[in-house]
From Swiss-Prot:
Belongs to the ABC1 family. UbiB subfamily. Its main location: membrane. This is Probable protein kinase UbiB. Pathway: Cofactor biosynthesis; ubiquinone biosynthesis [regulation]. It comes from the Bacteria. The keyword Transferase applies. Is probably a protein kinase regulator of UbiI activity which is involved in aerobic coenzyme Q (ubiquinone) biosynthesis. It comes from Xylella fastidiosa (strain M12). It is a multi-pass membrane protein.
């Protein structure tokens, strides 16, 4: 019953914001129209809004889980139209906080001790509140300032109920929408379910932060807060408290004397290093999660502060290599290579003609190269390439789509800090240096050295394994020879059977013909009372039947 009321509310909100137009021609749209008389008249202001804005407003009204749904949907540019994706990026994940006393109970249950024994001070008024969790300031007994992230009470059940409802809606859309094969609604919901499941485990988020901190511990480009593991559990995450300026607060950055030009270049370098050196990148890098260190001593050498580690990205080694090669091919305007890489990577089927892909890549990239370099977006070029490649049955892993969205965010932050930022000039040497290091003989030797214990462990078994493999090959060949002989014998048997069947059919036919000729008494030669042709036909037919019987 609860699910029914929730579904009715969703339908009501969809009609209020004219989202039935997104379901044109489907059974779902017809059902929604039946409910129109029970929905207040749609205001002219809403009607005039774009479909993307109407969807964004509807998701905000439906509540925090649907806001999160919209945010995740905005990262899947391969599944949603560009105008809708651009609007969903603006969704704000801000909701009313829950009671501080409730937060204390959750913390005590998760950590197995009282708040007083865990913290010298705990502020029950949250610093920030979002759909999944909220953050409180606290001080440890050793006087270190920390922030405590606490999951919302009963959030797992709320998400489970809404996901179940979304799955039902996705199934309905898949069976009724004419473009369901392009929208792939069930794939979208599955992606949302996976992402939300990861965000519900704060211990996992702590592990992400810890790994990222280890990669950048000695860096002047970005700082990752320390995880306080003694105060962290599945529903509670405690981190070192950071003070900084949001990267989109340009006025405050200027007032603090921060070198924005140096900062913007660092952002691009950090991203490419995370992707191609560490293979572990912050995949939710919008301005709210990327701050700038406000330490006055860092005005001329500023650094970023990373926050919120719920969504991290990793690529397979194969995708990592082909993506890097794609970037280099774009830098060199080598459209043939771009086309070849898409096929070699398995993103596009082998049967697609390289020449067609090359022409498509040229049509995408050339218009961008007529602009000044400072106005070229590598993320936009990549997104357009993938969009065009969808015509050729493009298949991409979700992590690649996540990277594309992150690159778009990073470039946006960089251009906000420095509108004249030349991403190509900054990114190219970083990428070339990382690729040279990654595929150098030294790196190969390092990888070999890393795997040496494993190699040495299995080395004594190698001769036996080789001998076993050779024996299997010989046995397999013998077995194949036996099978071949059996097949040949069977083929000969079938050929003989075929000949006997033919002889039997011919013999029967000739005997029938002999009988008919005998009965008709045709003109011509006779041997006694028997027509010669009847006699010949009968003899040949009898011989053919005897041949078929004798061979059997």
């Amino acid at each position: 019953m609860k699910a029914l009321f929730r579904a009715c509310r969703i339908g009501k909100v969809m009609l209020r914001y004219r989202l039935d137009t997104l379901l044109d021609g489907t059974a779902a749209e017809r059902w929604l129209r039946l409910a129109k008389p029970f929905v207040p008249r749609i205001s002219a202001e809403i009607v005039e809004q774009s479909r993307g804005r109407r969807l964004r407003l509807a998701l905000q009204e439906l509540g925090p889980i649907f806001v999160k749904f919209g945010q995740i949907l905005s990262t899947r540019r391969d599944l949603v139209p560009q105008d809708i994706g651009d609007e969903l990026v603006m969704l704000q994940d801000r909701v009313e906080p829950f009671e501080g006393q409730t937060a204390r109970i959750i913390i005590e249950t998760a950590l197995g001790k009282s708040v007083e024994s865990a913290f010298a001070h705990f502020d029950t008024v949250p610093l920030a509140s979002a759909s999944i969790s909220q953050v409180h300031a606290a001080t440890l007994h050793d006087r270190r300032e920390v922030v405590v992230k606490v999951l919302r009470p009963d959030i797992e059940h709320q998400i489970s109920d809404d996901i179940a409802l979304l799955k039902s809606l996705a199934t309905l859309v898949e069976h009724t929408h004419p473009n369901a094969d392009k929208i792939r609604p069930r794939e979208i919901v599955a992606e949302i379910e996976t992402t939300l499941a990861a965000e519900l485990d704060l211990q996992r988020e702590g592990a992400n932060a810890s790994v990222l901190r280890r990669f950048w511990e000695a860096s002047d480009d970005i700082y990752v807060p320390e995880v306080i593991w003694s105060h962290t559990a599945e529903r509670v995450l405690t981190l070192e408290r950071m003070y900084g300026i949001p990267s989109d607060d340009i006025a405050l950055l200027d007032a603090s004397g921060i070198d924005r030009k140096a900062l913007s270049s660092k952002g691009i370098r950090v991203f490419y290093t995370q992707v191609f050196r560490d293979n572990f990148f912050h995949a939710d890098a919008h301005s709210g999660n990327i701050w700038v260190d406000s330490d006055p001593a860092r005005k001329s050498n500023p650094r970023f502060i990373a926050l919120d580690f719920g969504i991290m990205g990793q690529l397979s080694q194969k995708d990592q290599y082909y993506l890097a090669e794609n970037f280099m091919a774009i830098f060199h305007k080598d459209y043939r290579r771009i086309a070849e890489l898409h096929v070699e990577a398995g993103w596009i089927p082998q049967h697609v003609r390289i020449e067609e892909l090359e022409a498509a890549a040229r049509s995408v990239c050339e218009p961008y190269f007529t602009r000044p370099l400072s106005q070229i977006s590598l993320a936009e070029v990549l997104m357009k390439l993938f969009h065009v490649a969808r015509r050729y049955q493009l298949t991409l892993q979700p992590q690649l789509i996540l990277l594309q969205k992150t690159l778009l965010n990073i470039e946006g932050v960089g251009r906000q800090l420095d509108p004249e930022l030349d991403i190509w000039v900054v990114a190219r040497p970083v990428l070339e240096r990382i690729l040279r290091a990654r595929y150098s003989p030294r790196h190969a030797l390092k990888e070999l050295n890393k795997r040496l214990p494993e190699i040495m462990t299995h080395a004594p078994d190698t001769p036996r394994l080789i001998h076993t493999w050779l024996v299997q090959q010989v046995e397999s060949r013998k077995q194949n020879d036996v099978y071949l002989q059996q097949i040949r014998a069977l083929a000969m048997t079938l050929q003989g059977l075929q000949r006997r069947v033919v002889n039997a059919i011919v013999g029967s036919g000739l005997l029938v013909a002999a009988a008919v000729l005998y009965g008709l008494h045709p003109d011509g030669l006779y041997l006694g009372t028997i027509p010669v042709w009847s006699l010949i036909s009968g003899c040949v037919g009898a011989l053919a039947l005897f041949s078929a019987w004798w061979r059997s």
